[in-house]
């Protein structure tokens, strides 16, 4: 399928897009993560971007994509409520991997948001969704627009949650192509990649955190908990960036 044909997929209804992409995804499932990135760079339109929350396994996709496409813009949506260890991890990986980091934030500061709306994350699912819209979704939409992105790489994996269990390698979202090169990797493959390339997990991994987001909606894993329960009080798994 030519690049022009792929562009035309964006004009189709969602169901038709999924059906049209099914054959391509069947082929992509047989490729390695590195081959998927190379295929996308050859067959999908630029500009290209990579998003990262700089979470537990973030070093994998940051290293993998940046090795193949040096200087690719790396989008971080900073809520202002990340753990101190996350900000330190961002600095460490940006320096080590020479990342072209692009930080986007909400138009309202965290203090201003609390003054206007209260602590949205304490206001149930509706409050959490509003918080995510302000601090994650709008900044990401702005980033994609300002960077003129047409192809978006992300480091999601099916093993991470039920909401990600059936995601394809290639899809369309927010009017761009979205590529998930390590979507089928398990925890062992992640560990092996980190070891092979001298990379580290997020610092909070050693303290029992399986997933890391904002300080107020992230919980340390305890025996008997599902990974989904460590984020957003178990009410949600996704922050909104990878939905829709």
Swiss-Prot record:
Alphabetized UniProt keyword annotations: Cytoplasm, Oxidoreductase
GO cellular component terms, A-Z: cytoplasm
Coiled coil regions, renumbered to chain: none
Enzyme class at the top of the EC tree: oxidoreductase
GO molecular function ontology, one term from the record: phosphoadenylyl-sulfate reductase (thioredoxin) activity
InterPro entries in the record: PAPS/APS_Rdtase, PAPS_reduct_dom, PAPS_reductase_CysH, Rossmann-like_a/b/a_fold
Pfam families per the UniProt record, alphabetical: PAPS_reduct (PF01507)
Catalytic activity: [thioredoxin]-disulfide + sulfite + adenosine 3',5'-bisphosphate + 2 H(+) = [thioredoxin]-dithiol + 3'-phosphoadenylyl sulfate
Main localization, broad class: cytoplasm
Domain of life, per lineage: Bacteria
Location of this chain's protein in the cell: Cytoplasm
Pathway it works in: Sulfur metabolism; hydrogen sulfide biosynthesis; sulfite from sulfate: step 3/3
GO terms classed as biological process: hydrogen sulfide biosynthetic process; sulfate assimilation, phosphoadenylyl sulfate reduction by phosphoadenylyl-sulfate reductase (thioredoxin)
Active site, UniProt feature: 239 (nucleophile)
Record family assignment: Belongs to the PAPS reductase family. CysH subfamily.
HAMAP family: CysH (MF_00063)
Function noted in UniProt: Catalyzes the formation of sulfite from phosphoadenosine 5'-phosphosulfate (PAPS) using thioredoxin as an electron donor.
Name of the protein in question: Phosphoadenosine 5'-phosphosulfate reductase
Species the sequence originates in: Salmonella choleraesuis (strain SC-B67)
């Amino acid at each position: 399928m030519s690049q022009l044909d792929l562009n035309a997929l964006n004009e189709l209804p969602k169901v038709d897009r999924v059906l049209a992409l099914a054959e391509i995804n069947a082929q992509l499932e047989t490729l390695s993560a590195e081959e998927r990135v190379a295929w996308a760079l050859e067959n999908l339109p630029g500009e290209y971007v990579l998003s990262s929350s700089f979470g537990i396994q973030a070093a994998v996709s940051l290293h993998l994509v940046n090795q193949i496409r040096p200087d690719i813009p790396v989008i971080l949506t900073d809520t202002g409520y990340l753990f101190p260890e996350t900000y330190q991890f961002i600095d460490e990986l940006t320096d080590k991997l020479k990342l072209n980091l692009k930080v986007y934030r909400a138009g309202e500061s965290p203090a201003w948001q609390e003054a206007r709306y209260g602590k949205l994350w304490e206001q149930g699912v509706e409050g959490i969704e509003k918080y995510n819209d302000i601090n994650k979704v709008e900044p990401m939409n702005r980033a994609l627009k300002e960077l003129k992105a047409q192809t978006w790489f992300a480091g999601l994996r099916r093993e991470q949650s039920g909401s990600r269990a059936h995601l394809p390698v290639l899809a369309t979202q927010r009017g761009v192509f979205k590529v998930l090169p390590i979507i089928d990797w398990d925890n062992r493959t992640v560990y092996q990649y980190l070891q092979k390339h001298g990379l580290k997990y997020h610092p909070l991994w050693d303290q029992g955190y399986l997933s890391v987001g904002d300080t107020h909606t992230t919980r340390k894993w305890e025996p008997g908990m599902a990974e989904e329960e460590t984020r957003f009080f178990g009410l949600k798994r996704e922050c909104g960036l990878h939905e829709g």
